[in-house]
């Protein structure tokens, strides 16, 4: 059974918030700019983090009742193709952190919904699917290959 996450845009903070469908929480944004190094200590995750569930490549914090601590995901598989009509997604997101016009928040929200969640649900865990977490998360890649640097992996 694939995990279902809700992707919601918070325009006030200009971040995408992910949370398990049906959860009461709106999720926790990871403070700091995109691509920042992870904090020195791991984020606190409640004991009901859903480790007993089939994660299928999702970070263990995705099932936390407080919401996942990592909010921004993309798929290396999509970045290897020409499906992304906006060009190189890491460059686009990096430009947004600098305050430059690149991709609208609506386009970003649609990109994450269409490219990431559909792959998790339809394809599940596979060798070519690597999950990148922008901003860092100590719980990322629990079922995936060795982590890569997002901004140098495209």
Curated annotation (Swiss-Prot):
Residues 68-117 are annotated as: Mitochondrial targeting sequence. One of its GO terms (cellular component) is host cell mitochondrion. It comes from the Viruses. This is Protein X. The keyword DNA repair does not apply. Its main location: host cell. The keyword Cytoplasm does not apply. HAMAP family: HBV_X (MF_04074). Keywords: Activation of host NF-kappa-B by virus, Activator, Apoptosis, Host cytoplasm, Host G2/M cell cycle arrest by virus, Host mitochondrion, Host nucleus, Host-virus interaction, Modulation of host cell cycle by virus, Transcription, Transcription regulation. It comes from Hepatitis B virus genotype B/C subtype adw (isolate Okinawa/pODW282/1998). Belongs to the orthohepadnavirus protein X family. It is found in: Host cytoplasm; Host nucleus; Host mitochondrion. May form homodimer. May interact with host CEBPA, CFLAR, CREB1, DDB1, E4F1, HBXIP, HSPD1/HSP60, NFKBIA, POLR2E and SMAD4. Interacts with host SMC5-SMC6 complex and induces its degradation. Interacts with host TRPC4AP; leading to prevent ubiquitination of TRPC4AP. Interacts with host PLSCR1; this interaction promotes ubiquitination and degradation of HBx and impairs HBx-mediated cell proliferation. InterPro entries: Transactivation_prot_X (IPR000236).
